[in-house]
Amino acid sequence: MNEGMLWYDNQGNVDIKDRIISAIKFFESKYGYVPEKCFVNPATLENPIELNDKTKVLPNNRVIVNHFWLEFISE
């Protein structure tokens, strides 16, 4: 995990995929491009998620539950 944006979303009644898509849309509106990676707590990510060919969703123990770490494009 390098530089990025931390997103908090505690809407437990909303599908995790939809929550991540909302975070990605905000990230794109703020920075002008989609994040390269989205890290989530392994407890939140029960199954692998396929979103698009640009953003990889990966588990990481360093991310707190209900948070998403959206990583900037590496140079």
Question: Predicted segments — roles?
Answer:
Residues 36-39, 46:
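Amphipathic, hydrophobic secondary-structure cores in small proteins
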Residues 44-46, 56:
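Short, basic interhelical loop/turn and adjoining N-cap
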Residues 10, 40-43, 72:
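Short beta-strand-to-loop capping motifs
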Residues 3, 34-37, 66-67:
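Short, surface-exposed beta-edge/turn micro-motifs
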Residues 1-30:
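N-terminal acidic leader/helix
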Residues 29-34, 52:
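Short secondary-structure junctions
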Residues 52-75:
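C-terminal edge-of-domain segments
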